[in-house]
From Swiss-Prot:
This protein's name: Ribonuclease P protein component
Keywords assigned by UniProt, alphabetized: Endonuclease, Hydrolase, Nuclease, RNA-binding, tRNA processing
Coiled coil: none
Subunit structure: Consists of a catalytic RNA component (M1 or rnpB) and a protein subunit.
GO biological process, one term: tRNA 5'-leader removal
HAMAP family, A to Z: RNase_P (MF_00227)
Family: Belongs to the RnpA family.
Pfam families hit by this protein: Ribonuclease_P
Keyword DNA damage appears in the UniProt entry: no
Cellular component GO terms, alphabetical: ribonuclease P complex
Name of the top EC class for this enzyme: hydrolase
SUPFAM superfamilies: Ribosomal protein S5 domain 2-like
Swiss-Prot/TrEMBL catalytic activity: Endonucleolytic cleavage of RNA, removing 5'-extranucleotides from tRNA precursor
């Protein structure tokens, strides 16, 4: 696998995995509409993404998920190996207007705040 790939093993898929991260993880947020739960001490790095239906139609929700996945994929080498995270996007101000750079800035700030980035 390449350095910037996004393998299937790194995706949270099962409901029990999502619930475990919600239950055991700690929430981090920069706004009411963008919350990340990070669970440290996991066996391997994994991510799950949930976008509320009230955010918009499927096109909008899927675009937001693609943006989050792309930021994760590009920053994957810089994230710690022992974290599981769940990104939850709720309706809010300017959520539909998100672009790659806004998502990147938000995620990096939250990852720094949570200590999810590897020490350089």
């Amino acid at each position: 696998m390449g350095l910037f790939s996004f393998p299937k093993e790194e995706k949270l898929r099962k409901q029990e995995d999502f619930l475990r991260v919600l239950r055991e993880g700690r929430p981090y947020s920069l706004s009411k509409s963008f919350i990340i739960y990070i669970r440290k001490g996991a066996e391997k790095r994994r991510i799950g993404i949930s976008v509320n239906k009230k955010v918009g139609k499927a096109v909008v929700r899927n675009r937001i998920k693609r943006l989050i996945r792309e930021v994760y994929r590009l920053h994957r080498p810089y994230l710690r190996e022992d974290i599981e995270m769940l990104v939850i996007v709720k309706p809010g101000e300017n959520i539909k207007d998100l672009d790659f750079h806004k998502v990147k800035d938000m995620l990096i700030k939250i990852w720094e705040k949570a200590g999810a980035l590897k020490e350089q």
